[in-house]
Amino acid sequence: MRQGAPARGRRWFVVWALLGLTLGVLVASAAPSSPGTPGVAAATQAANGGPATPAPPAPGAPPTGDPKPKKNRKPKPPKPPRPAGDNATVAAGHATLREHLRDIKAENTDANFYVCPPPTGATVVQFEQPRRCPTRPEGQNYTEGIAVVFKENIAPYKFKATMYYKDVTVSQVWFGHRYSQFMGIFEDRAPVPFEEVIDKINAKGVCRSTAKYVRNNLETTAFHRDDHETDMELKPANAATRTSRGWHTTDLKYNPSRVEAFHRYGTTVNCIVEEVDARSVYPYDEFVLATGDFVYMSPFYGYREGSHTEHTSYAADRFKQVDGFYARDLTTKARATAPTTRNLLTTPKFTVAWDWVPKRPSVCTMTKWQEVDEMLRSEYGGSFRFSSDAISTTFTTNLTEYPLSRVDLGDCIGKDARDAMDRIFARRYNATHIKVGQPQYYLANGGFLIAYQPLLSNTLAELYVREHLREQSRKPPNPTPPPPGASANASVERIKTTSSIEFARLQFTYNHIQRHVNDMLGRVAIAWCELQNHELTLWNEARKLNPNAIASATVGRRVSARMLGDVMAVSTCVPVAADNVIVQNSMRISSRPGACYSRPLVSFRYEDQGPLVEGQLGENNELRLTRDAIEPCTVGHRRYFTFGGGYVYFEEYAYSHQLSRADITTVSTFIDLNITMLEDHEFVPLEVYTRHEIKDSGLLDYTEVQRRNQLHDLRFADIDTVIHADANAAMFAGLGAFFEGMGDLGRAVGKVVMGIVGGVVSAVSGVSSFMSNPFGALAVGLLVLAGLAAAFFAFRYVMRLQSNPMKALYPLTTKELKNPTNPDASGEGEEGGDFDEAKLAEAREMIRYMALVSAMERTEHKAKKKGTSALLSAKVTDMVMRKRRNTNYTQVPNKDGDADEDDL
């Protein structure tokens, strides 16, 4: 009874409120309507159940007389209607309402109308009580800090070494008359003794010309150039590499002197000092030189600081350690300023030397991989997860720390980690955070060692300090000391690191997505629950004002509802097709002046051929079966009503035009759900070991070995000089040695004699070489043949002169004498008659004068050579001779006849 009293009070309050509202409506309806109110006559027929006025034209339709409508032009609102007394004028001035409604239905074909009968109370519902919302999931035990990640050091230990050896070459040559042939070449490499390295090479920059070594358990000695022992100067190599230098004593190979048809031997000893790179890998029991030579001794072996326990495979007399050794630069002859401890080892092929250093500070089995400024440590079950956005990686470790004492040769880990952490802290966190304790070390999956320094902000640090002081005051004064570490006597081991980091990156991706999704779903669930509880309170109050809308939104379909105390009675609404609904164009009540309908009147059919039902348009396309929504008519009336998929606009209680939903600005009532989308995260390329590290991890660099072996001849030998075998070399060598023993005078005489002999030998050698050349022999043969041919023709000509001088000297004249057509010929031939004595005398005279002319020309030619006086004498002689001779002959014409040309 106590609980029902307030409810009855509220119901009586509602009843009295409705009664007062009804009286107000009646008083307002009794007032006369405005004389200028349009549409009264048009609405009268519709209100009395008459036919509705046709609908106005659709928006955007052009007038009847305009053949070219403009596109995208909104229809102009119709002119204000005339007074209600002229219904025909109103119908003619306005477009029909039915055409407008057809256009709206065509644009929104999915809009339906509903007829909702009043609920009877047969079905009642109630709202659920507010639920208890879940709490937001708390995060894990997160700790921020600085981390340095270490990986296995696969790089070898590198150091500089010096090789001392002598290349011994013994060549056997057989000399023929025109060629030389190698019958055998023996090459070997001998080590340099310790004394020669220290006293000769390092002290003076010289090397002995002999090589003493053991082969097949026999000690043998090789002499350079097959001569006695001397000191040879070391000179830089021809082509030095970027990583090493070299020195040697000779460029050319020594070949024996030429002695034909004999086998000769020649020995070359080339002392070579070469700086090379050496490398050794864990456990550092041996090292290899850049030349490919292995040394089966630890590079840290020695006689100091317990290094004699390191591995060695050689006898004790083959090794020597020199303290206070000052190395010398063989190029500049400069001596080092600081002494070193020098190790020297002799092998059967070479002697190697290097500077000794202790093993502990020099090598480390772990190396620094990544420095992480922000590393987040979280606890998941029985493991720690170290995550970093900078490297997109998550490492999983145990909850217990990993002692550094278990890492073999791990002295560098603590130092490198502290240096990196101090540098990062000073750069980023010095003003905002403090360090919590000492660095912690954890062994992660995959063989990564994580050095982690936890950090704490200054604000939290102050709170923790206060709480710590408070707890310390409650503890007993003498706490028990912690037990010693269980790993104090643990054996050392080497950590093996995997070459791939993909598993850690996949773990990071999974953790990133899991954390984001879980946090997002947790926030969504909490927000959704709280929102539902808030809306439930609003719905409980809103159902009292509009139970139909609240019930429809709750049930999910159109229903009608009314309150029955604290519950709602609901009834299902019947859908009506949009084509079966017609709206009236007037909202005035003709029988009651001053009263108007507050919502438009409609006529509809439940079925296409069913009877017409009169009603009133409700909210949200609801078709009310009653027309009791009445209000007093007011001036300046403007209303928009939802009709189908759009709106109809009434002005002064008369239809004006229709609008689509797009013409009305929409105000959203939805609350945006603040869900953070998964952020884009780019994975940067991350390599545990680079290609250079992997390539450099081996003990032997085959590329460097091949390069050095192929450059050896180029560096320590002259490959461009060619020595030709000379048969006279032995003779010249003997003459040179003979004159060398006679002092300075003998050397001077020897130079002259050897020069003359050399010229003669060169000339003979030149002729011999020319004759030995195929082209030279051919040329000589051709010249000999040409000489023989010339001698033959000369001999023949002389014989002709002796037998017939005239025919030999004057062959053309002789031919004319033989020609029978010549009128001067006697016609008798040589066989007929005797010669003419007169003509014979003339011929003899002509020959005598020809000899005289020839003598005069020779005299004149000689006078020209001797000078002017002789020339004058020749002229005078010529004049005398001209006066003495008689011109008893005529000059023979120079032109030959055609017959002579034919004879020729």
Swiss-Prot record:
Record localization: Virion membrane; Host cell membrane; Host endosome membrane; Host Golgi apparatus membrane
Positions of region (Disordered): 31-88, 470-492, 883-904
Lineage, top ranks: Viruses, Duplodnaviria, Heunggongvirae, Peploviricota, Herviviricetes
Task of the protein: Envelope glycoprotein that forms spikes at the surface of virion envelope and binds to the host cell entry receptors MYH9/NMMHC-IIA and MYH10/NMMHC-IIB, promoting the virus entry into host cells. Essential for the initial attachment to heparan sulfate moieties of the host cell surface proteoglycans. Involved in fusion of viral and cellular membranes leading to virus entry into the host cell: following initial binding to its host cell entry receptors, membrane fusion is mediated by the fusion machinery composed at least of gB and the heterodimer gH/gL.
Disulfide bonds: 116-573, 133-529, 207-271, 364-412, 596-633
Main subcellular location: virion
Intravirion-facing ranges: 796-904
Compositional bias (Pro residues): 53-66, 476-485
Name of this protein: Envelope glycoprotein B
Signal peptide from the UniProt entry: 1-30
Keyword Glycoprotein: yes
Keyword field: Disulfide bond, Glycoprotein, Host cell membrane, Host endosome, Host Golgi apparatus, Host membrane, Host-virus interaction, Membrane, Signal, Transmembrane, Transmembrane helix, Ubl conjugation, Viral attachment to host cell, Viral envelope protein, Virion, Virus entry into host cell
Composition skew (Basic residues), residue ranges: 70-79
GO biological process, one term: virion attachment to host cell
Family under the similarity heading: Belongs to the herpesviridae glycoprotein B family.
